[in-house]
Amino acid sequence: MTPGKHSGASARAANGGAWGYRDFRGGQKKGWCTTPQLVATMPVSPAGSHKQQNFGLNNATQPKKSISFFATMKATSVKGYTGANQSRMAVSKTVLIPPELKTVEKPNPNIKTTQVFDINGTDVTPRPLYHPDPLTGTAKPSKLLTSQEGSLGSEFISSYSLYQNTINPSTLGQFTRSVLGSSTVSKSSVSASESIAEDLEEPSYKRERLTSFTDLQVIRAAPEKIVTKEDLEKNIEIILTETETLRFFDLPTVMVSVESEEAEKVTQRNKNYEVLCRNRLGNDLYVERMMQTFNGAPKNKDVQCDKIIMEDKGIMSTAWDLYDSYNAMELVSLSVKQSVVESSSKANVLPKDQDQRLPGSTTEKNSETSSLMDIENVILAKIHEDEEDHSDAILKSDKFHQDLFFMERVLMENIFQPKLAAYRQLPVLKEPEPEEPEDVLESAKHEEVEEESKKEEEEEIHAEESTIPANLERLWSFSCDLTKGLNVSSLAWNKTNPDLLAVGYGHFGFKEQKRGLACCWSIKNPMWPERIYQSPYGVTAVDFSIGAPNLLAVGYHNGTIAIYNVRSNSNVPVLDSSESPQKHLGPVWQLQWIEQDRGTTGDGKREILVSISADGRISKWVIRKGLDCYDLMRLKRTTAASNKKGGEKEKKDEALISRQAPGMCFAFHPKDTNIYLAGTEEGHIHKCSCSYNEQYLDTYRGHKGPVYKVTWNPFCHDVFLSCSADWGVIIWQQENVKPSLSFYPATSVVYDVAWSPKSSYIFAAANENRVEIWDLHISTLDPLIVNTANPGIKFTTILFAKQTDCLLVGDSDGQVSVYELRNMPTVLETGRGDIMDTLLGSKSNQSA
């Protein structure tokens, strides 16, 4: 079939094209008829690709009528027509009618519609899927794809044929849904959903829709790139940049109130600082430079805590407690009964006529019961108050405090019984274990076996102790929370009660001064002191009186001397030298009570208090109406003896800042209390007499530093011992001004030395970091026992126990440790002084 040619065909195609019809009865292509009036031509494909076909319409069809579909629609290919491809496109479509079909148009003056009938006369007109709202106005054409109004050029036909032949349905469908569907459909037109019908009412509306299409641009999908192994191994550079700081919330801190007086000054300073920060950028006056800081290396330290002491507490209810409690309840019930009887007796006293007036009154009964309840409450409250007053009186009574005091001592003795037994050299008591009931014979045999085993164990222990060298075993320490961190400056035993110890706490250095403390400790209670005397100044010396053991003399770092009565619980001193015009101007380094003869005319002895201070004065204090002070000696600086040779001239003496030498220690002769030794800061030891206060009897030169302690030998009265800051300990003889024996065992300051009360050739020395026990009978080169201090702790004072083989050592942490001397060599009862004299006589000029 050749396509027909007619002049109206092109116009028809331009206006909207024709629309075709397929016969589904046999799947065969029907014949097509053409009319000379109207010919519809499909868009022509490129040459050689598809055949051009003409379709004719029935004569009954009205001229210039077409059906336009703007919704997305799927065109079904007709068998035998290669130009009809499947596509999804929002463009106008032409329906082709075969010649067998007849088109009949119903006359309607208002709305012109087109109906399609088959050969049998059946109406096969397609029904629209979308019914437009007649009340809605016509949609305006979109200007997105509009080229010119009222015309559709040949470019649209050519592009349409190109899409029909080359574009993939899936690609075109996506494009038409996103671009054409959204750009051409309005509220009054068809929607973007798929449809196969369109409104056929007004041709002007269709023409506006056709004129809105322009050339379509194809969006081709880029082919996916195949990723190879080389692409995976390539290095990908990712550059990270810092974004700007986003502040979600900024609340400036306010340190000064706006209403304060300093608000204006602070505001002005802030403004000046902001101006300074702004001017800093780009200013030549500011230079950036780097600084290196030193960071301390971290250290791992092990800390050992104190032993956690567990206590078992119990409550005992005795028979008299139960009796008192029950008796109190009976007293309450009796008092209530008595009140009830009294109220009833008062009611019986009333006249009979008053009782007969209100025989059945309930108000009287209620009032009587309420009054009885009130009386009971008052009685109970009064009893409770009496009990509280009674309990307060008991708790505040002196008898109760005394009972608690003794009870605490008993508990401490039970806890420290093994330690106290070792201190007093007594056997340790072991608690008997509970035994099951046995026969008498078996128990007796068992006891005999135990006694034999104990004897064997004791023999073995003695044999082992003979092989173990001498050592120090720590028993306990006098310390509490008040003394922790304070320096132990002095120790003193009570002259009458050997279980009472006075301890002074205070630092030696002027810049290290803290609060001072003087405590009286008892062996019966090592956990808490019996008396506590606090002071704002450090305590440097303490000593108990000989004639009045209850008097304790305390010297302070500010030069004050105070005397306390330890029998009283008062913390106020009985006497002090704070108001005395002769008080010391420097620290009182030593105090001692001395008994002296009253003179040739007087009988007996008198007791004086002697003190030495850093102001260069040795003073005695006499208790009369107050503390009267007299100077025994004013220590003067001495020049070293010049050893000039012949032809040498004497050098001029150096100018002295102070002509007085600070005194550090003193020691009175054990037999002749008129003679005493005084150690000075220069390193000299002066022998002085109480009868002469203008000059020294002798001067012992041997130390190169301050002399901290001088003490006489308790058995050889012509031998004394001294220690100094020059790391040395020297033994002197009274007749020889040169050292007899010198000991320099360590490179540390020796703060204190003490002779043993049981041996003339045993003494102890307290260095900064260790305690040494020397036995001159065994060796003069090495100490017999050495006990090292803990890290960071310094030993400051030392004192032997009077009646036991124990040693007390004070340190810089506020502890006074008690050590037992184990396996010491036996002490000869006779010839103590002879052995010392022989030792010093043979080695008088030997230095160790």
From Swiss-Prot:
GO terms under biological process: axonemal dynein complex assembly; cilium movement; hematopoietic progenitor cell differentiation
Tagged with keyword Repeat: yes
Single GO MF descriptor: dynein heavy chain binding
Pfam families listed in its UniProt record: WD40
Region (Disordered): 345-370, 431-464
PROSITE patterns to which the protein is assigned, alphabetical: WD_REPEATS_2 (PS50082), WD_REPEATS_REGION (PS50294)
Keywords of this entry: Cell projection, Cilium, Cytoplasm, Cytoskeleton, Flagellum, Repeat, WD repeat
Bias (Polar residues) ranges: 359-370
Keyword Repeat: yes
SMART domains xref list: WD40
WD repeats: 534-574, 583-631, 658-698, 702-742, 745-784, 790-829
Compartments in which it is found: Cytoplasm, Cytoskeleton, Flagellum axoneme; Cytoplasm, Cytoskeleton, Cilium axoneme; Dynein axonemal particle
GO CC annotation: axonemal dynein complex; axoneme; dynein axonemal particle; motile cilium
Highest rank taxon of the organism: Eukaryota
Intrachain disulfide bonds: none
UniProt biased composition (Basic and acidic residues): 442-456
Annotated InterPro entries: Dynein_IC, WD40/YVTN_repeat-like_dom_sf, WD40_repeat_dom_sf, WD40_rpt
Subunit structure: Part of the multisubunit axonemal dynein complex formed at least of two heavy chains and a number of intermediate and light chains. Associated with axonemal dynein subunits such as, DNAH2, DNAI3, and DYNLT1. Interacts with DYNLT1.
Primary role: Plays a critical role in the assembly of axonemal dynein complex, thereby playing a role in ciliary motility.
PANTHER family associated with the record: DYNEIN AXONEMAL INTERMEDIATE CHAIN 4, DYNEIN INTERMEDIATE CHAIN
Protein name, UniProt field: Dynein axonemal intermediate chain 4
